[in-house]
Every structure is written in structure tokens, then in C-alpha cells.
Amino acid sequence: MSSEKQFEFTKENIDLYLKEVAKEYRKQAGKKMPAELVLIGGASVLINYGFRNMTTDIDALIQAASAMKEAINHVGDRYGLPNGWLNADFTNTDSYSVKLSQFSVYYKTYANIVTIRTVAAEYLIAMKLRSGRQYKSDLSDVLGILAEHEKRGTPIAMEQIRKAVIDLYGGWESLPETSQAFIENVMEDGRFEELYEQTASGEKEVGALLVQFEEKYPNVVTGKNVNEIAGNLQKKTDRASILAKLRERKTEVEQKAPKQERDAPER
């Protein structure tokens, strides 16, 4: 993580840059070399939903001729975009699955040669849960997706999420225990929009604490320990984690239920 200001991709400029990449790719590869990009993560969220304003890079599965790399770099140079602005680095992370393309949906075709696809809703949720980073937007994205589908009248059921996790990763137990507990609790609670605001705020707080930690202890944080460190930093804040709040609320409801049964008049 870095405290330096990062480039922000929005729904509007993502479309512009992808269109320019397609045009450049067609110039270099010709008309007979079709390509496909499956947008993952924040880019997929931006394109399909309105609750998130930006992402700092564009992750994608890239199926194309070698000219695609040059096209991406050319567009990046032209618009002053950061190195790796469009990349497939996520294929080296735990959230990657070889089956992602199978569960993608059509978005657009540019220059009659580059097809853009995104990840279907419940599979995007599965990816976010698999990653489960407390210092990024993973868990708030899950809640945002659930909230928007509820508003659209196309709510996502727990069974759909379980199936998506199994389809991509082979089993429910493939998720981190914190992600399992998180999704089970929020699905039972159902206040997706309210929980989204709380979770997004908590993620920003933990992210800021992690930046401070890295400045104080350089070269300590790695890809393997970052989630553990972020979790410990979250516990040290005054704000209780959203998961802790959900568990507390669930306990209160369970404690009230027996009392209500005892107080109920006999018939």
C-alpha cells in the first residue's frame, strides 16, 4: 500500500480507455485476430453498479494476440496512465479461478474486434469473499451488490452465493473463516444498505492505519501477512468491526426470544 495519490478510473473513463485499446489493437493485430477481456474486481463493480465511484486499476482476464500488450502500453502512454493500469496480475491471487470466464457476461464490443465481458453478480461476490481484504473494498462491495440487486427486484439468495463459491473454488470451506461468518451474518441481518456505509467506513479506516503501519515498520507487510496485520489493526481501533456488531445484534435477538416466550400468556 502507498500514501501517494493513485490514478482513479471511473465508469466513464474506463469505457474511453477500453475503446482506445481496442482501436489500437486492431491497428496492430489486424481485423482477423479477435480478443476478449473479462473485467474483474473493481472495474466489474463500476460497470455494473452505481454505489462505487472509482477503482485504482483495471484487472482483467486477457485472451488476445501479443499485440494487446503493446496496445495497452500505447494507450497508457497517450493518456498518462500508470504502468500496469490494465493487467492480469490478479491471476496470481487466491481469488483467481480458471472457471471465471465460464461465469462471465457480455458487456460491449469495441472496434468490432475486442469483446468486453464482466463477472456475473453472485460470482463477483464469491471472488470478493475469497479475497476478504479488510483494508480494501472487498466486503463493502459485497454489501453494495446485494443492496442494488434488492432495489432492482432481483435479490441474490444465499444459495446462489454458495453455488458460486463452489463453482469457482470447489467448496464453501475455501473461503476464509472471517468471510464465511461475514456473509452468513449479513444475509441473516438483511440491512445491506446500512451495513454498506458502516463497512466502507471501516475499510477506509483500516487502510489508513495500514499505511501508517508501513511507514513506521517498512518492509514488514507482505502479501502473506497483510490480512492478519490489517485484522489486528482493526481490533485496536475504537470502532467495533461490522462482524462484531452483527454478532452482538444476533445475540440480543436470541436473548429476547426466550423472554418473550416466557412472558407470553398461556392459552
Residue spans for each PLM region:
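Intrinsically disordered, low-complexity terminal tails
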Residues: 255-261
